[in-house]
Regions:
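Conserved beta-strand signature within the Rossmann-like core of class I S-adenosyl-L-methionine
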Residues: 116-124
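Conserved alpha-helix/loop element of class I SAM-dependent methyltransferases that forms part
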Residues: 1-19, 33
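Core SAM-dependent methyltransferase catalytic element
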Residues: 160-177
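A short acidic, Gly/Pro-enriched loop at the edge of an enzyme's catalytic core
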Residues: 79-90
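A short SAM/SAH-binding and catalytic strip from SAM-dependent methyltransferases
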Residues: 88-102
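Class I SAM-dependent methyltransferase SAM/SAH-binding core
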Residues: 21, 27-80
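Short alpha-helix
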Residues: 135-150
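A short glycine-rich, Lys/Arg-flanked "PGG" loop and its adjoining helix->strand segment in the class I
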Residues: 103-115
Length: 177
């Protein structure tokens, strides 16, 4: 996938300016796509355990947008409590598949969102994984799971081919509880 694919997976969500987090941001592929869509007046909290990946993200953000203002880097495990403001939206791109108990992690991230806040999920569209993608979930599985964690029924946004595990999908669900 390239930057255009990342943007195109998020674009159908029609996000507006606000306060967002990219949980499991890594080196920032989807953080950069999110920034392109929500603009420089939005605040983005990029959360990842890997400090060096966050440093790469910061450099890439500065190179692309000539600023790191309103980009807040947090070196932390998002499955633990975080000090974040109420969020308008969360991006979880290829981070949910690291958790076996997905309902538990979804309930956890649910608490970071404002009422009606958006959860954008990007995942491999398969239910069986490998050592690098241990617990993926198809859109159909996610569609069933998300409402049990306090979200609306997810809406499929887009799909792009994957060289490794068939395809990626993006979906949006909203905090309802």
């Amino acid at each position: 996938m390239d930057h255009n694919d990342h943007v195109n997976l998020l674009r159908p969500a029609n996000l507006s300016s606000g306060i967002y987090a990219d949980l499991g941001a890594g080196s920032g592929a989807f953080t950069l796509a999110l920034r392109e869509l929500v603009g420089l007046d939005s605040t983005i909290h990029a959360v990842d355990r890997d400090k060096s990946a966050l440093q790469e993200l910061e450099k890439a953000h500065r190179a692309r947008f000539h600023s790191t203002e309103r980009l807040l880097l947090l070196s932390s495990d998002f499955s633990h409590p975080l000090s974040l403001p109420p969020l308008d939206g969360i991006v979880m791109a290829n981070s949910l598949h690291f958790f076996k108990d997905k309902e538990k992690i979804l309930r956890h991230v649910h608490e970071f969102l404002k009422p009606n806040g958006a959860l954008l999920t990007i995942e491999y569209n398969v239910d069986s994984g490998n050592m690098w993608v241990p617990h993926p979930l198809t859109f159909e599985t996610y569609h069933t799971l998300a409402p049990h964690a306090g979200f609306s029924e997810p809406r499929l946004l887009a799909k792009v081919p994957s060289r490794f595990l068939r395809e990626f999908y993006s979906a949006i669900a909203y905090r309802i509880e």
